[in-house]
Amino acid sequence: MLLSQWLLTTCILISSYVHAADQFKPKVVRTESTGWFNIYPFDDSKVILKNEDTFLSISDNNGETWRPIEGINDVRWSWIDKLYPKTRAFANSKVGNKIYMTDDQGKTWTTVKINEKEYSNGSKSELSCNLISHPTKPEILLAECYVCDYDEEQSNGSITKRAVSSLFDNFLNSIMRDPTCRNEVFISTNSGKDFTKLNIDLKEREESNLLYSTLNCQFAIASKQSKNTETDSTIYCTRKHFYGQKFNDKNEADKTYLVSSFVKTSNWGKTFEELPELKGYLVNYFEAFDSQLLVITQDDAYNRHSTQKVWISKDFKTFKEAHMPTQLRFMINGLISEDSVGRLTMPILRTNPDKKDSSDKNEDNKKMHHTDSVVSDILISDSRGTKFTFIEWMNSNDVTYRQISSFKYLKGTLFGHTQEYPNLGNKGPSFEMILRSKVSVDNGNTWSNLKIVDPENKSKYSCNIDIPESCSLNIMSMFGTPDFITPGIMMVNGAVSDGHHASWNETKTFISRDGGVSWKLAFEFQTATAFGDHGNVIVAVPYDPESDDDPQSEFYYSLDQGTTWTEYQLEKTILPMQLISTTPDGSGLTFILNGLSMDSTGGSRWRWNDKKETNFVYSIDFSDAFEEKACVDSDLEKWYVAGGNCINGAKYRFDRRRADSKCLMRKIYDDLAYTEEICEKCSDDDYECSYEFVKDSSGKCVADFELLSLSGSCAKAKNGKISLKPKQRIVNTLCKVDMKIEDVLVPCTEVDSPENPDNIITVSENKFDSALLTYKYFDTASDESLLMMTLDNEVYVSHDGGKNIKKVNTNREKIVEIVFNPFYSKDAYLFGRDGGLYITHDRGQTFTKSQLPETRQLGLKLEFHATKQNTFIYYGGKDCDSMFSEKCHAVAYITTDGGETFSEMLNNGIHCKFSGSTFKDPYNEDQIICQILDSSNGKKKLVSSTNFFKSDSQTETLFEEVIGFMSTGEFLVVALPHGDDELRAYATLDGKEFAEANLPKDLSDIKQESFTILGSESGSIFMHLATSQNIQGEFGRLLKSNSNGTSFVSLESAVNRNSAGFVDFEKIQGLEGIVLINVVENTDEVERGTTKTKKLKSKITFNDGSDWSFINPPLKDSNGKKYTCSGKGLKKCSLHLHGYTERNDIRDTFSSGSAFGMLIAVGNVGEHLLPKDECSTFMTIDGGATWTEVRKGPFQWEYGDHGGILVLIPDGSESDTLLYSTDFGKTWIDYKFAGEKIQMRDIVTVPRDSAMRFLIIGQSNSIRGGTTTVFSVDFSKIFSRQCVYDLDNASNDDFEFVSFNPVKNQCLFGHQAEYLRKIHTDCFIGSAPLEESFRIVKNCSCTRNDFECDYNYYKANDGTCKLVEGLTPSDPKDICKKNPDAYEYFKPTGYRKIPLSTCVDGLNLEGTSSPLPCPGKVEEFRKNHKINGRSFSLLFILPFLILLGIAWFIYDRGIRRNGGFSRFGEIRLGDEVIEENNVDKAVNNIVRTGLLLTSSVFSGLQLVKRFIGKSFQSLRERVTGRRGPSYTTLFNDQFLEGADDLLEGHDEDANDLTSFLSNDNNFDIDTEDDGNTFAPFREEASEEDHGPVTGDSSNNEEVSS
């Protein structure tokens, strides 16, 4: 009976309790607000701050009621001090030098000010500051301030706004846009009562060159847990000075110079000292962590995108460089984190540093690409911080956002998250994406997918959740996710998928109770979530109120750890902006929901409420849940992190409430506690690979020879091997008994070799399973990115010069071609076999996919617009079921959105050119010139349009029949058929006027069957006309035009070419006027066909082709022996080089545009050029004047660091060794870079030859090419410092100016030039602005060499310039259009100055006519030429009147009254004349004297004329033996130089200038002998050593009839 009554009573009590729990609702209090605000709760209290507009409010009851803080009404933003979250807060005032501070949870506030004299530079200044507290001494404050100077006309408010924006923007980018702003750091030791500026000065250069400076400081003690033994007063700082020019976002290379220093103070900033180990390094960033100090240095002072090094100090005193698996260039400074054992996680930015800024006027270029977004890689270090590795599964080349998240109470647990957009187009992001998420519970050693364990909802998923490898949860993003202060209870938004596709619409809310290992569905929509009572109370608010099919807003709450949910309807419709727990430690029961009021307009659309009450604050209180019952031990369960496995040598146990317990923990303000159970025995998880080892694909630690080399371990090796432990214990792991790690024997044969002391050269090796078809670098300074395509039609990308190589994801589509944009060097296009077009605008960092028109790919090269990045032309075959189909024809398609869409532009178009974008002065900037193929007869015609061929009215036929056309420099050259199997060339500079290329008269009998355009770098066209086309006997005439391409002169008559039209012709890059050619000596034998072996000889010119000579040979060979032909003269003993026609890769030029004066070539010394395998390798460092032999045998070469590093590999043979030189070729060192010999194929580096990394490509010899091995050889550590580049202080830098002209004081292009060259060999050049390294020492006086025939004029036989028949002179008024400041022009004389000439004064042939006023500039013309009345009177009228009066007086008194002029011839000196006074006598004496002088001069001239005439006649008769009339011819060498400065010696008819020289007073006649002044070479070279030289490749574009 008693038992039954007890049971009944108990059941009633339980029933009532359950009923009460079911009826529970939280206490919700709503307050309204008129503006935007943010909420900041103090820890362990009910006090909350609200920053609303400019006011600060406070609540003492978890947000139920609010009151304004009196006296504070100018707040810009506020924050709780993270080091003292229970008491301290700051509020930044709109008045920049004022900050409000509280140390008692807002009860009282003090005003902190920085005295203006501390930060003002004498001008008006405003500043905005952020205060940082000392971790252990709250009275110590650092103020990081951004100071902006302004003048009286500027408003303080705008200045403050700029300073404030700098706090939230990257400061460097901000200050680049506004150099009037700077940052400063101040310190206070008395809680902000006064501040002192930290003064750290760097005086490396003149302050006038200082662009701006930055200062960043941090307390040495990072937190109360810091292991730093420095004193509390220690502060680290880095000061950076930027000199030079302001950053320009349109250019990737910044013309700035960085000077920085890393210092510390141990007395609150009174004195500073440099950290000696980092002295001389460019410190870019630093951060003090609890267990280590991290410093990042920049390698190149002239390139803010240069490689960086990471330095780690565990004792905060000595530093060790950390090994990075890739070049470190872009990082997210400030987001580097440290875990409990000292591992560092480092996100690396892959941003687009080349993006256009808003000032770019080209709308096409301003379209935003996805590549402007951040794409990151994640690196993680070992526990010692000295070796970083990639998280391999996160590597991808799609548009990817990567993130690693860890949480304080989940020891050893990491979440990895990526969002990829593989099909993202240029028009904006797509909602289609690939999500991938993984979890690791062992510090990242192993990773697994996020399992879905949710059998009751299994049917709601699109994949089989029982197979987590292909169906798992992928988190949308963990940015903004709360720091789960719970024992393993978590909620996220994500989508369940196979990892290949996801959509925002599929995103739902999921919950986990085991630390993120397994998950189940919570809501079928996205929510914002918050936790209370350490996870026992959960609140979730839908982002979209209609997501639950209910238009009214609501929140959901769970009191059983997410097992069940209860809905709470809100009275107002809101957009949730903020949901937080009022207790930051997660222990409380009250939440704040901040939402914007919204009005429904039907459906799922919402708009802002127009009323002022737009903001609501909801206080949600769960204090009464479960009738305030607190949990007891029986309500708890034990839960272990990572399933109870040892993490860092310990197990971590939480005593958490069971999900079904009807109670709350109610330990308000108690931090979440766990029990640490030390593991007895250590396991593999307590060890990591030793420094010299890395994990292979199976997880085994294997030796890495690069790391082995860096460690120096092999210094102790015996017999070439060393015994090492492959694993080491993780720092700070807590396990007690160590594992036994067996030593392994590691070979050291390739480490610490004599040729690689101190491990200064590092090598990385990668293998491909097939041969490489093509490989090419992007030509940028941002990084060393290149694309490689294999024989299997797969594309790979590397961003660090081949050290790390990743496959480009094309969804298994084969790639048939890679095309680079020649005008935008970071752009490339991959053409897929199935019509896919993969586009990168950021050097292969990311690719987007587009679709080509549904046509057959013809393989015709794309045509790009020179100024519009997204505009190009693609050629596709239409109606091409078969390439042999009669209907198959080409169509030119155009895109203006970067390949996103294409439109048909021109039917039968096979070759187009955006000519209007390439001409210097186009007649229409929108002009396109296209070649059309008539499939019916195979003929081609040339047409142009100015509106993409949209209308016939703007389409013009230029030539009815052409063979082809090409562009070179500023010219466009068209080849037309002429007669039988001949052609003619026409050139244009503007796309409208075409002029026929007039060849020298002696070529009139030669058929023009084939010519090759060789380039126009010097303003004239170099052209090769084939004069012999016998098989294996091809050669021809080398010609050069004037600057408008209308007339040519001959340079050399038998220059070698091959059957493909390539010519042995190479201009030396970077130097003016130096060209190398090979000529055929046995032309008669070759033309007759009696031999197929051409005897080639090499020649060089130093004046752009005017004079040629054989190349001087070295005195001795590389073995110190004399050549057998020595002493026989240059004709029998000169240097001969293998040229352009024999190259496997036309990019392998003799020279480099950045290594001035250096050339390397393969050749021989003798009478003729020998086969390559009988040759040696030579180099020169003075532009080709003198040469040295480097080694016997042929080698391939490459230049690095602008010639500071030279590398050679054997050409075409097996080897494992390279040669390198760092002293301009004076000494060479052998270095073994491979473990075994491989077939050498190529050596390459960046196009600018500025890097210190080289890529060597080797290949096996199987049928399909077998495997390919690429070696990335890094010389970056070979130099101890960067060269000092300071042209203003020549005595203190590492450069000097040198001349490469072998004839001193000789002028070319009107000047004498010098080039900058590095002096010392212990430094590297890097990105120093060597474009300024060319200087003109002297501008020469103008001579005939500096003029050429004007547009539509040609050089006649008499040497003068005459108008081409049928053409008219160019409109002289064009100068008025091209130069808005011009007010006058001259009529054309037929001559104009050569564009490259800088001559001054001297001969003037182009402006001898009288000036005429420009249209609309008559008044300005008159103003500059007229003389005013007074000046005219003084200068002309008055003197004229005086002279007239004197003349009349003399005539009247001395001539008229003595008989007049009729007696003039009769008067004798003694005759009587009228003399009445002294005046008459004086006048008569003047008349007598004038008469005597006139008579004497006239008589003398007659006698001399008669004598000279007779003498000359007699001499002529004696010499010629005949009599006849004689003619006087004006002759001078100066005038006989060619119309394009090359006539002398090339046109024997151009020697009569009589018709031209109608007024010889117009010219200076130079009578000096012009001789062969450009042939300075001696028969024997001197004994002194010489080094290398480099040059430019020619266009070598051929047109044949």
Curated annotation (Swiss-Prot):
Protein family according to the UniProt entry: Belongs to the VPS10-related sortilin family.
One GO-annotated biological process of the protein: Golgi to vacuole transport
InterPro entries recorded: Sortilin_C, Sortilin_N, VPS10, VPS10-sortilin, WD40/YVTN_repeat-like_dom_sf
Localization annotation: Golgi apparatus, trans-Golgi network membrane; Prevacuolar compartment membrane
CDD domains from the UniProt entry: Sialidase_non-viral
Gene Ontology CC terms: cytosol; Golgi apparatus; membrane
Ranges that cross the membrane: 1431-1451
Taxonomy of the source species: Eukaryota, Fungi, Dikarya, Ascomycota, Saccharomycotina
The protein's name in its UniProt record: Vacuolar protein sorting/targeting protein 10
Membrane-topology annotation of the record: Single-pass type I membrane protein
Signal peptide, first to last residue: 1-20
Record topological domains on the Cytoplasmic side: 1452-1601
Pfam families: Sortilin-Vps10 (PF15902), Sortilin_C (PF15901)
Glycosylation sites: N121, N156, N457, N505, N1044, N1289, N1339
Segments of skewed composition (Basic and acidic residues): 352-369, 1577-1587
